[in-house]
From Swiss-Prot:
Name by which UniProt lists this protein: Tumor protein D52
Species for this entry: Mus musculus (Mouse)
Similarity section: Belongs to the TPD52 family.
Coiled-coil parts of chain: 61-113
Tissue specificity as recorded in UniProt: Isoform 2 is expressed at higher levels in kidney and brain than in liver, lung, testis and heart. Within the brain, isoform 2 is highly expressed in the granular layer of the cerebellum, the cortex and the hippocampus. In embryos, isoform 2 is expressed in the epithelium of the developing intestine, stomach, olfactory epithelium, neuronal layers of the retina, salivary gland, kidney and dorsal root ganglion.
Highest classification ranks of the organism: Eukaryota, Metazoa, Chordata, Craniata, Vertebrata
Gene that encodes it: Tpd52
Length: 224
């Protein structure tokens, strides 16, 4: 049995070439993930093409945008330009710091505090806002709206006044006024000509209260 197993093991040959990752018979295996065999015109084309993954600590941006091949002269020129730009940035930073220091000294001598400067900035900012076309249009719109609202309120007041006059001149109101006048004439005497309706109501109320407070005649005769 062991001899037979040894013979099968010696005769067996794997269909895969594990050194190159190529199945010469029917299947292509590649550690890079590309499904096209070597030499195929579609080897670098397709949806399954994979990109190399950045290792830990490796700059992925540098991998994605690999630098172009530069000559030594070009690299040296770029280095000189880089050094020059860095020196210019440092010089500008020093100049800016000196200017800011000089500005603070001038403000101190003029007595300009941070609060005053803040107020000036607020005032200037508001002035700039009021000078814009958007603010002017908004202000005009609000002004027109206010005028329309005032006109509407005036119209409402006029309508209410007219309605009250119409009610006062209506036959129903006049009939009620005549009844009140008749009641007053019966209770407190005749109403003088030209009397006010408010006076009529007050007189009627006073006469009614007087009648309710006076004792009946029978009680007055029985009392000693």
């Amino acid at each position: 049995m062991e001899c037979r197993d040894m013979e099968l093991a010696d005769d067996y040959q794997s269909p895969f070439d594990f050194d190159s990752g190529v199945n010469k018979n029917y299947l292509y295996l590649s550690p890079s993930g590309n499904t096209s065999p070597p030499g195929s015109p579609t080897q670098n084309v397709g949806l399954l093409k994979t990109e190399p993954v950045a290792e830990e600590g490796e700059d992925a941006v540098t991998m994605l945008s690999a630098p172009e091949a530069l000559t030594e002269e070009e690299q040296e020129e770029l280095r000189r330009e880089l050094t020059k730009v860095e020196e210019e940035i440092q010089t500008l930073s020093q100049v800016l710091a000196a200017k800011e220091k000089h500005l603070a000294e001038l403000k101190r001598k003029l007595g300009i505090s941070s609060l005053q400067e803040f107020k000036q900035n607020i005032a200037k900012g508001w002035q700039d806002v009021t000078a814009t076309n958007a603010y002017k249009k908004t202000s005009e719109t609000l002004s027109q709206a206010g005028q329309k609202a005032s006109a509407a309120f005036s119209s409402v007041g006029s309508v209410i006044t007219k309605k009250l006059e119409d009610v006062k001149n209506s036959p129903t109101f006049k009939s009620f006024e005549e009844k009140v006048e008749n009641l007053k004439s019966k209770v407190g005497g005749a109403k003088p000509a030209g009397g006010d309706f408010g006076e009529v109501l007050n007189s009627t109320a006073n006469a009614t209260s007087t009648m309710t407070t006076e004792p009946p005649p029978e009680q007055m005769t029985e009392s000693p």
